[in-house]
């Protein structure tokens, strides 16, 4: 990633749902932000969420109220970065650099 490195075992989750008008833009931002890195992201449908992942969210006191929601997983510790908002590429890259 230009200008910094990411923490090992970092992953992003983009929580979406059908008819979400901002979800395609959020996925495009994430794709661009992690381009040229070893990071990946996983899209998760809010209404068909894996129960284990849902439990992880609850353990980390993360409640998804709107989509798109972007969750950072740093070695198992989940953090809600954005909910109902499409961040900029620069905002995502800054978070991933830890700034």
Region annotations inferred by a language model:
Residues 71-99:
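Non-catalytic, surface beta->alpha helical segment in thiol-disulfide oxidoreductase systems
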Residues 2, 24, 47, 60, ...:
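Chalcogenol-based redox active-site neighborhoods
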Residues 60-71:
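Structural micro-motif
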């Amino acid at each position: 990633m230009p200008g910094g490195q990411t923490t090992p075992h970092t992953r992003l989750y983009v929580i979406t749902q059908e008819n979400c008008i901002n979800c395609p833009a959020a996925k495009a931002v994430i794709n661009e932000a992690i381009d040229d890195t070893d990071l990946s992201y996983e899209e998760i449908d809010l209404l068909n969420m894996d129960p284990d992942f849902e439990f992880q969210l609850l353990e980390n006191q993360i409640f998804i109220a709107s989509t798109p929601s972007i969750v950072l997983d740093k070695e198992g510790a989940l953090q809600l970065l954005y909910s109902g908002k499409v961040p900029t590429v620069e905002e995502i890259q800054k978070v991933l650099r830890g700034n």
